[in-house]
Structures are given as structure tokens and as C-alpha cells.
């Protein structure tokens, strides 16, 4: 059974723009699958449809054999609990401490009123500290999140997903705003948790070299359609040119500004 299954998935926006066209994909447990394509190709739409941040127009998406497309209420909450999300701009509460931001990964496990009051059980705090240690920022746990660098804030986001105990992590351009050194650190963290914990990673990346270095599988989107799906080791420059519809530029290969 695939961990994520897209079956005939399409998305049409109210203005008539087609975001996704008849997507059929199976993402297996433990994969590090990278979605690539030009801006507007449908990468974020595809990624965000998995946890229903974007609802699809037709088709169906399954998580471990259960339809998240048809899920509602408690069933949807429980399915989302298993799907961590990492955003390009971190999506942290800036004035809150690092620890409090990581603990927000536990909100799906407790009544809302307890979370509003910050009444997290001791076990949750232990999970949060363990997650921070795994991404090497445990020493920052009591600092305000906005006092940290961009790379450190993205590591808080990763720790939050780990604290959530997600079996799937969706990462939407997580290194787009980071410098090359910090990019490597964040990508190394994602690869480490993928390899050591078996967490499935589905990630959007802009840079070709990063996709080939870290991905086990490349999924190429062009105008909302899958135009390539195969091992990262077989994704040549010619393949990327097909995905992009033109020759790849040097700054798209190397990830430099």
C-alpha cells in the first residue's frame, strides 16, 4: 500500500486557471521525493493538496489507503496529525519561544483550551526537547524564535514536524530564502530524519543540483502535468530541460543568487 496516492487528481481555480491535470502518483513509505518545475507549474498546489491546504476539484488523494479527500471532522484531524508541514517562510509565532513553537506540533493531540493555556504534558515537552536536539538547536529552546537566524528558524519548523510524530513531512520550498551553507544544513537535517527515522519526505525544490543530491526520486511538473517521474540518479540535464521546457540556467543548477 502506498503511503500517498494521487488518483486522477485535478485542480481548477475559480478564475479558470488549471493548477493540476489528472495527476496519478504513488509515494512509497521512506521515499525522499522531490517535485521540480518552473514557478507556476503546480508544485505548491500538488504538495498542499496532500493535507488539504488546497482542496482538489476532481480525483482523490489517499493517505495509507484512506481517502483524505473525503475525510471530515475528527477523521480529517487525525489524518492531518500524521502529516507535518514545513513552509518557505517558517510559519512560526515569532514572539514565542523556540520550545513553545515546537510544542505547537502537539496541538492535534489535545483539547484546544489546553493548548491555548499552554498546558502541555511533561511527555510532550520531552518530545519537543528530543526534536530540538535532533536538529542541533536544543541550546536555543528558551529564546524567542525571531532572535534566531533563518536557518535556525527552519530547523524549528523541522523540529515541530518531528514533535508532531508525523510519518510524512511536506516541505514547500524550505530553502528558497536561505544562503548556500544554511541550505546544506537544513537539507542534511531532512535527509537525516528520512534515513534514520524512515519519515517520508515530499519536497518542492527550485535548484536542480539539490534535487539530484538529496532526492531518491524526481517528479517533474510542467503546466500542472507530470512530465517526468523517475530515480534521481537518472535525472540528467536533458531531463530537467524537458521539465522546464528550456535549457537550465546556471543559477538554477547551482542554487546561487
From Swiss-Prot:
Tell me what reaction this enzyme catalyses. Answer: phosphonate(out) + ATP + H2O = phosphonate(in) + ADP + phosphate + H(+)
> Its topology with respect to the membrane?
Peripheral membrane protein
- Annotated GO MF terms: ABC-type phosphonate transporter activity; ATP binding; ATP hydrolysis activity
| A Gene Ontology cellular-component term | plasma membrane
Classify the source by domain of life: Bacteria
Ranges where the ABC transporter domain occurs = 4-248
Q: Where does ATP bind?
A: 37-44
> What Enzyme Commission number(s) appear in the record?
7.3.2.2
Record's SUPFAM superfamilies?
Answer: P-loop containing nucleoside triphosphate hydrolases
InterPro entries with a match to the protein in the record: AAA+_ATPase, ABC_transporter-like_ATP-bd, ABC_transporter-like_CS, ABC_transpr_PhnC, MetN_ABC_transporter-like, P-loop_NTPase
Which keywords, in A-to-Z order, does the entry hold?
A: ATP-binding, Cell membrane, Membrane, Nucleotide-binding, Phosphonate transport, Translocase, Transport
Where is the protein situated, by its record's location annotation?
A: Cell membrane
Q: Which Gene3D superfamilies match?
A: P-loop containing nucleotide triphosphate hydrolases (3.40.50.300)
Q: What do we know about how this protein assembles, alone or with others?
A: The complex is composed of two ATP-binding proteins (PhnC), two transmembrane proteins (PhnE) and a solute-binding protein (PhnD).
Cite the NCBIfam families for this sequence. Answer: ABC_phnC
What the protein does comes down to: Part of the ABC transporter complex PhnCDE involved in phosphonates import. Responsible for energy coupling to the transport system.
User: What is stated as this protein's family in its record?
Assistant: Belongs to the ABC transporter superfamily. Phosphonates importer (TC 3.A.1.9.1) family.
What's the protein here called?
Answer: Phosphonates import ATP-binding protein PhnC
Q: Which organism is it from?
A: Staphylococcus aureus (strain MRSA252)
Amino acid at each position: 500500500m502506498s503511503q500517498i496516492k494521487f488518483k486522477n487528481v485535478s485542480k481548477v481555480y475559480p478564475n479558470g486557471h488549471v493548477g493540476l491535470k489528472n495527476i496519478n502518483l504513488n509515494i512509497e513509505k521512506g521515499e525522499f521525493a522531490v517535485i521540480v518545475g518552473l514557478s507556476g507549474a503546480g508544485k505548491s498546489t500538488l504538495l498542499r493538496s496532500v493535507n488539504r491546504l488546497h482542496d482538489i476539484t476532481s480525483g482523490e488523494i489517499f493517505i495509507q489507503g484512506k481517502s483524505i479527500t473525503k475525510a471530515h471532522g475528527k477523521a480529517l484531524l487525525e489524518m492531518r496529525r500524521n502529516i507535518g508541514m514545513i513552509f518557505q517562510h517558517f510559519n512560526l509565532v515569532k514572539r514565542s519561544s523556540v520550545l513553545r513553537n515546537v510544542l505547537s506540533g502537539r496541538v492535534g493531540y489535545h483539547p484546544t483550551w489546553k493548548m491555548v493555556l499552554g498546558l502541555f504534558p511533561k511527555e510532550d515537552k520531552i518530545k519537543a526537547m528530543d526534536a530540538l536536539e535532533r536538529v542541533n538547536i536544543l541550546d536555543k529552546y528558551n529564546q524567542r524564535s525571531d532572535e534566531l537566524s533563518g536557518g535556525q528558524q527552519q530547523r524549528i519548523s523541522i523540529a515541530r514536524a518531528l514533535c508532531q510524530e508525523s510519518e510524512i513531512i511536506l516541505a514547500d520550498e524550505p530553502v528558497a530564502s536561505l544562503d548556500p551553507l544554511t541550505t546544506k544544513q537544513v537539507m542534511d537535517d531532512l535527509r537525516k530524519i528520512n534515513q534514520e527515522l524512515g519519515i517520508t519526505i515530499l519536497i518542492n525544490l527550485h535548484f536542480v543540483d539539490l534535487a539530484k543530491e538529496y532526492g531518491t526520486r524526481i517528479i517533474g511538473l510542467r503546466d500542472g502535468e507530470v512530465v517526468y517521474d523517475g530515480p534521481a540518479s537518472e535525472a540528467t540535464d536533458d531531463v530537467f530541460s524537458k521539465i522546464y521546457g528550456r535549457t537550465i540556467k546556471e543559477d538554477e543548477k547551482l542554487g546561487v543568487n
